[in-house]
A protein has these predicted regions:
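A contiguous pocket-lining binding segment that forms or flanks enzyme active sites
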Residues: 196
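Nucleotide/phosphate-binding catalytic cleft detector across ATP-hydrolyzing
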Residues: 1-154, 173-188, 200, 207-302
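Ser/Thr-glycine-rich phosphate-binding loops at phosphate-binding pockets of nucleotides
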Residues: 159-165
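PRPP/pyrophosphate-binding module of the type I phosphoribosyltransferase fold
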Residues: 166-171
Length: 302
């Protein structure tokens, strides 16, 4: 079984499932076993809020444990056998791909095989046979080659939880020299917006409320708080567009593909005066994970 996983700072995504990348350890059984991973005698509640930012994802076991939870969730969704062999298809930003590739592969492909654990009180026995790594963002375009057709140059803007990753593709090939990673992800926007709402209204709105308003979804909230969130959403998009320009890219001259969790926010808050050349939005947060799987399937088919 091929399982594609996008290890985001904000959320863990597979082809079919997404949950927050938070994790809390318990020495004793929690009050509910929902989303609970039991591994080596400890209990881990997966998907609870957001964990402390760790730029090196291999510095602790959190992302490994979240990987096991993601495998279990994907098996559950596919109604597959819980004793199975898995090939993991994962990604890294192209800007750090060469530097981090080997370490991240070894982090996920451990000597302890098969990996045995309980998830939501059900037993899993997983043989991780291999870990394939691909550039994130670019891999999602494996699902949408039409966005590159007849375009000599395209700018890919992946707005993630902590970073905005930029990459220009020339004749559908990534130009490694153009890769940039800006620390302007959605987490920054949400944190700064929450603080601005507190200052202006005295209200302490939640991350989930802010997200819903930024995406234009319904949410019961004081109108003055809603206005602050919407205004901050526009300011956030202006910061991203300005930072992209300062990084040497002309959004008015080159077609752009926006993806990641923040692409939906950008689509809602971008205006005609921004003059973006042929913007395309991949709003599916599962696109990277699905793209990783597609590439491995294509490799097998050859």
């Amino acid at each position: 079984m091929i399982v594609g996983i996008d290890h985001g700072y904000y959320a863990i995504k597979t082809k079919h499932v997404s949950f927050p990348s938070g994790i809390i350890k318990y020495d004793y059984e929690p009050y509910t076993m929902q989303n609970v991973l039991q591994y080596r005698g400890k209990y881990y509640v997966c998907g609870t809020g957001r964990q402390t930012l760790v730029k090196n994802k291999t510095s602790n076991d959190n992302y490994y444990l979240l990987t096991l939870a993601a495998i279990a969730e994907e098996i559950k969704h596919r109604k597959a056998e819980r004793k199975t062999e898995v090939i993991l298809a994962v990604g890294l930003p192209l800007s750090s791909f060469g530097r981090e590739k080997q370490g991240f592969r070894e982090y996920l492909l451990r000597k302890e095989q098969p990996v045995c654990f309980l998830y939501e009180s059900e037993w899993y026995e997983i043989q991780i046979k291999d870990v394939k790594l691909f550039p994130q963002g670019y891999s999602a375009l494996a699902l949408h080659p039409e966005y590159l057709k007849n375009e000599p140059s395209v700018l890919l803007v992946d707005i993630g939880g902590w970073t905005v990753d930029l990459m220009r593709l020339d004749n559908a090939v990534p130009n490694a020299a153009t890769c940039r990673s800006l620390e302007l992800g959605v987490i920054r926007c949400i944190d700064e917006t929450a603080e601005q709402v507190r200052r202006n209204t005295g209200l302490s709105v939640t991350e989930t409320q802010i997200e819903r308003v930024l995406r234009g979804e319904t949410c019961s909230m004081a109108e003055d708080a809603r206005v602050v969130i919407q205004e901050n959403g526009r300011k956030y998009i202006e910061r991203i567009l300005s930072a992209v320009t300062e990084s040497g890219f002309d959004l008015r001259a080159v077609p752009s593909v926006f993806m990641g969790g923040g692409s939906e926010i950008l689509k809602r808050h971008v205006i005609a005066q921004d003059a973006i050349c042929r913007p395309v939005f991949i709003e599916d947060v599962h696109a990277n994970a699905a793209g990783y799987e597609r590439i491995v399937e294509q490799m097998w088919a050859k």
